Amino acid sequence: MVKSSVSRMLAGNGLFYPIIGFASFIAFLYLSFGDLWVNYSKEINLSFVERNGTQFYVDGKAFYVNGWNSYWLMDHAADYSTRPRIRTMLQASAKMGLTVCRTWAFNDGGYNALQISPGKFDEKVFRALDHVIAEARRNGIRLILSLVNNLQAYGGKTQYVKWAWEEGVALSSSNDSFFYDPSIRRYFKNYVKTVLTRRNIYTGIEYRDDPTIFAWELINEPRCMTDPSGDTLQDWIEEMSTFVKSIDRKHLLTVGLEGFYGPRSPKKSIANPEVWAADLGSDFIRNSILSTVDFASVHVYPDHWFHHKNFEEMLKFAAKWMLSHIEDGDRELKKPVLFTEFGLSNDNEDFEPAQRDRFLKMVLDVIYKSAKRNRSGAGSFFWQFLVERMERFNDEYGIVPWENPSTYRLITDQSCRLAKVQGLLSTQAEHLKNFCAPRN
């Protein structure tokens, strides 16, 4: 009744439609630029993560990572209907005591592409990445940002080769020409420079100056199978890591390896899952030992690598796999080792929910023991965490952690254990003090 009377009054004065039009305009501005009005002045102060030998440090204290993967953050931030998921994920993770998220800072040539074509960027998607970084900062979460995919998902090296081929400058249509084609290398360097020097519209900080970013990752799971000697990929890593460091010397850098030992490694026959692993063109030691690479990365997917082992055999292998790489970090690399992806598929024929928790606990236990002994195993990252109503983004490894009480307990227990070793970080204190105290 009141609403209709007001409407008649405004209409009688000829003001109804102008006001409605103005309101629509304001709504449009909010949908387009609404985050510019969000108060980002209350972010938690973060310091850069540094490395000294085999350990990470923050403000002079050892820093061990209980982290996770949510590769989809930028993509979902680009659509206002899904943008709230970023805050939900980051807030929930902070409450679990998680400290670092690994996510994609790339999307090449597809839907919600950050890089539409070589050197051409979508400002809307860049603002989405700005939003992700600003939200992470507000919640005291650091980010590992990966710069390109070896796989075809979200463009990857396949898209770079396609662009060069379409422009008539490609040397080869092989996906692996990404690593050696001069034109494609220029494409990628331009992309890297654009991202590293981007000024966040919400915080006013260039990415290369923002301690919210834990590290850059050159490429997710690099393989160059057309050159199993490893020389092609090694040359690319040397060139690109040097290029990144020429622009940004404040942040740490890793390659993004799965951890397989190459044909020249004495461990190729005793630590690799199977013979094929030595012929992928990568080599954990050789690729990671470069002075421009600050820490090593390893993935742990025994059920993906083996097809004829039972769960107990895979669990035993995974533990041995982790310890082998921690040994490498201590003795060969003299650098920290992060297990940046680990998971167990729920599509395995003999899968039982309890198996996943046993596998996760094994990984977390190895990291905790390494931290207690000041060894190089510096942290781990679950693959992957989702929020509700994201079923189509699940790849058989994903979980909504707060919907799985036993898994949730494992995550928070690890946060408490690492906090006991390193001391509570200032960003964790509010969330962890209450529920860690009874456990300690």
Language-model features, listed with the residues they occupy:
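N-terminal signal-anchor transmembrane helix specifying type II single-pass membrane topology
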Residues: 2-38
